[in-house]
Amino acid sequence: MPLNRHLRGDLKRKLSNNELTLGSWLTINHQSVIEIMSTAGFEWLCIDIEHSAISISDVLNLIGHIQGNGMQALVRVNENNPVIIKQVMDAGADGVIVPMVNSVQDAEKAVASVRYPSKGIRGVGLSRAQNYGIGFTEYQDWLKNDAVII
């Protein structure tokens, strides 16, 4: 299972219970910003690749810094695109925020992009999220119970 994944499963529970959670948006691609934000008490940071110059290739590194500083990492993707959603989830994101979801079909497409068959369309590429294959079963359980899809 990815780095301390079992210690970072609070966000979905808190959101489901309408509890207060403290997070912020990350639009600057620099680890020092993440370190500063972690000392401010944030529980999660959302990497915004829709409205910033952060690229998909930066996401893996930023997720590692966010999680390494004890916070959960969400990624706001730039579109409801299964390939992009799969990439950020494979990079180890704790969840994804999908913009421009305007219909039930849009929502179903976003959720299917996060999940594996038979509930989704995500292909298996053993990467950071699944601890490079060692924790795939645990990751599937985590994905089902704790992944955040907004």
Residue ranges and their predicted role:
Residues 24, 37, 48, 88, ...:
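Conserved, mostly hydrophobic/aromatic
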Residues 26-40, 79-87:
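Short, acidic/polar
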